[in-house]
Amino acid sequence: MHSRIFQISKMWIGKENYLNEDTLHQGDGSFYDYCAEIDDEERKEDIRYFVNTALPKDMFELVGDDTMRYIGGVEQWKENFVTNIRKKAEAITTENMLEFVGPVYQLEKALENPLDIAYHFYLDGEGYQSFAEKSFAFMEFVCTLEPGTILYIGGV
């Protein structure tokens, strides 16, 4: 379960291109039925929390109601990510590899959602993508950014 899906792009996103419940598929041929419009104040509050609390500390700053700036820091984040993945992989043994919610599952979670957040990401400003992605895809996107890059938040 994820509480929000954030549409993020390097291009400004017009309201006509905001994601909505009809934009996204869950991957099993069905739509995200809980993805519904929220009012402007709730959207602003969700964006503030997302940028100031959910994303890696000191890597982003909110510069407008729907605009954030990438400050930098992805190299340190990558070092921490690799260290965490190695630690989780080393915890896997032949005895515990099949445990329910065991170390294999924990490794899988860390690979797919390294930010360990309940958000998914829609990384398309024009509305062509039909699926939301977990935080690893967002961090792959961040790895392509230069410090100072402005990112626009569309639908939430």
Please describe what each predicted stretch is:
Residues K15, L19-N20, D46-I47, V51, ...:
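Generic structural signal of hydrophobic/aromatic residues within well-ordered alpha-helices
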Residues Q26-D124:
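Low-complexity, serine/threonine/proline-enriched polar segments
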Residues W12-N17, R43-K44, Y128-A132:
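Short, surface-exposed beta-strand/loop "edge" segments at domain boundaries and coil↔beta transitions
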Residues M1, D116-V156:
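Acidic, proline/glycine-rich low-complexity IDRs
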